UniProtKB/Swiss-Prot annotation:
Substrate binds at R74, S75, G76, N87, L91, I92, D93. This is Deoxyuridine 5'-triphosphate nucleotidohydrolase. It comes from Xylella fastidiosa (strain Temecula1 / ATCC 700964). The keyword Metal-binding applies. InterPro entries: dUTPase (IPR008181), dUTPase-like (IPR029054), dUTPase-like_sf (IPR036157), dUTPase_trimeric (IPR033704). GO terms for biological process: dUMP biosynthetic process; dUTP catabolic process. Its EC number is 3.6.1.23. It is an enzyme of class 3 (hydrolase). Belongs to the dUTPase family. Its cofactor is Mg(2+). This enzyme is involved in nucleotide metabolism: it produces dUMP, the immediate precursor of thymidine nucleotides and it decreases the intracellular concentration of dUTP so that uracil cannot be incorporated into DNA.
Length: 155
């Protein structure tokens, strides 16, 4: 069974995409995210604690207002090298049409060099549900109630 396919409009802002480097693509048949590349002119070294805003070389438009996109880190970069997103997760609204930028942050202990064309993040398109706020005085009781951080334990 194949997943539903929706269009994602992109503008190529860096002519190396689609020629020198592939366009954003899914790495495997079951990948949830499209790999995004660093559209750099030269290698860039991030020393520990540094954050930089990188171009992906594309602009996107989701078109469908029932969708959003999130920019997520690549697990290997974070685990092996300490390279994560500077803003945690990037949220892209369906009506955004500007350049797709990625904030990368070196939270590791060693300098890390990003080469032009390196895969630096992934883009996942998700359905959204818009809500209408209902102001209430009390909530209907749930099994958890107001139990917060650590409430359910670790075992």
């Amino acid at each position: 069974m194949s997943a539903a396919v929706k269009p994602l409009q992109i503008k190529i802002l860096d002519p190396r995409l689609g020629t020198v480097w592939p366009l954003p693509t899914y790495a495997t048949e079951a990948s949830a995210g499209l790999d995004l590349r660093a559209a750099l002119d030269a290698p860039m070294t991030l020393v520990p604690g540094d954050a930089e805003l990188l171009s992906t070389g594309i602009a996107i438009h989701l078109v469908d207002p029932s969708l959003c996109a999130v920019v997520l880190p690549r697990s290997g970069l974070g685990h092996r090298h300490g390279i994560v997103l500077g803003n945690g997760t990037g949220l892209i609204d369906s009506d955004y049409q500007g350049p797709l930028l990625v904030s990368v942050w070196n939270r590791g202990r060693e300098a890390f060099t990003i080469e032009p064309g390196d895969r630096i993040a992934q883009l996942v398109v998700l359905p959204i549900v818009r809500v209408v706020l209902q102001v209430v005085d009390t909530f209907v009781e749930s099994g958890r109630g107001a139990g917060g951080f650590g409430h359910t334990g670790v075992r």
